[in-house]
């Protein structure tokens, strides 16, 4: 059986940890190991880690944003890696779905929400995945909420290590840009068939609830920082499907 290492991200949603932990343990391809990168919020949120004896935790005294977990992922030992946002609860065949796509369709970067941009301001775009189910694998510009990939792609993430435009966003664009530039690989949303949610990358009810709560970056930060990051990578040569 293929092996998958999971990297969770903790900040202000301790209530989602148990759901995530139980979900990744119960996949048709169960997680071989589970890591957690915990950022330190301004107002300390209590996480109870006592019941998670096999969870490898890096608990920090600062908020390193969304980028550091991809450095932490270098500690994993599996062939495949899945990095999950803390608002994302994968369905039971999510890992299996991604592995099938990589091994039988196209190697590349996969995720549960795929985005195709219509402008560089990050205001007009098309989403695919749990928010807009796609029956077949869909090529996209970037993916978010989860990133599933062969560990060989992780090296490409760090080929360019310039200071990010923002520590709160841009890691998704950076990853897709780097694999496109250095590995000639693309980014995809695997199938999210309407009649089989076991393949989906996120529980849509929970994703909608967590993704718009008070701790959601997309809700609490103006889209201009996302647009600035997108323009940055486009200026460096990031090829977008509709632009």
What are the functions of these language-model segments?
Residues 22-32:
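Short, acidic, metal-binding catalytic loop of nucleotide-sugar glycosyltransferases
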Residues 3-7, 33, 174:
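Cell-envelope/extracellular polymer assembly enzymes that use nucleotide-activated donors
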Residues 1-23:
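N-proximal low-complexity "stem/linker" segments adjacent to membrane-targeting elements
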Residues 40-76:
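Active-site-proximal specificity loops/subdomain of glycosyltransferases
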Residues 15-20, 156-243:
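C-terminal catalytic/acceptor-binding lobe
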Residues 73, 89-163:
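Conserved catalytic core of nucleotide-sugar-dependent glycosyltransferases
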């Amino acid at each position: 059986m293929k092996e998958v290492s999971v990297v969770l991200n903790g900040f202000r949603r301790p209530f989602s940890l148990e759901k995530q932990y139980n979900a990744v343990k119960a996949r048709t391809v169960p997680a071989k190991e589970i890591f957690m990168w915990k950022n330190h919020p301004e107002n300390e949120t209590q996480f109870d880690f006592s019941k998670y004896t096999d969870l490898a935790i890096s608990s920090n005294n600062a908020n390193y944003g969304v980028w550091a977990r991809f450095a932490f992922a270098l500690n994993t030992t599996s062939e495949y890696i899945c990095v999950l946002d803390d608002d994302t609860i994968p369905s039971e065949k999510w890992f299996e779905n991604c592995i099938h796509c990589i091994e039988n369709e196209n190697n590349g970067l996969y995720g549960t929400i795929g985005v195709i941009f219509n402008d560089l301001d990050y205001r007009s775009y098309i989403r695919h995945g749990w928010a807009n189910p796609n029956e077949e694998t869909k090529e996209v510009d970037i993916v978010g909420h989860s990133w599933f990939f062969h560990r060989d792609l992780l090296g490409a993430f760090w080929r360019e290590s310039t200071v990010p435009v923002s520590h709160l966003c841009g890691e998704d664009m950076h990853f897709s840009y780097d694999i496109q530039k250095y590995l000639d690989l693309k980014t995809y949303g695997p199938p999210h068939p309407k009649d089989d949610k076991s393949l989906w990358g996120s529980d849509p009810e929970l994703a909608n609830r967590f993704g718009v709560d008070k701790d959601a970056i997309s809700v609490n930060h103006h889209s201009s920082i996302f647009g600035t990051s997108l323009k940055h990578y486009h200026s460096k040569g990031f090829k977008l499907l509709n632009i």
